[in-house]
Amino acid sequence: KSIPDAVILAFNTLIVKNWNGLASAFKQSDVIAYIASDNITEEEAIKNHWLDVEPIYRANGFGVKYVGRGSDAEFTFWKA
């Protein structure tokens, strides 16, 4: 199953919102809160691997780091 547009939009929005000029960092719980407005649950997103966006962003010129576990985990994006 491909990643829904709503999930990509959530990541794009959070990257822009948290951009400090060099990188953007935010918690997985921020993504979950954003996609909840599209009726996508945390369980559904995790079960379907919809938060595994790293390859998409790496293919589009970003570096991506994912640290931690669960809702406290943090994504960091930067221009590679």
Q: What residue ranges belong to the model's regions?
A:
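C-terminal edge-of-domain segments
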Residues: 56, 61-80
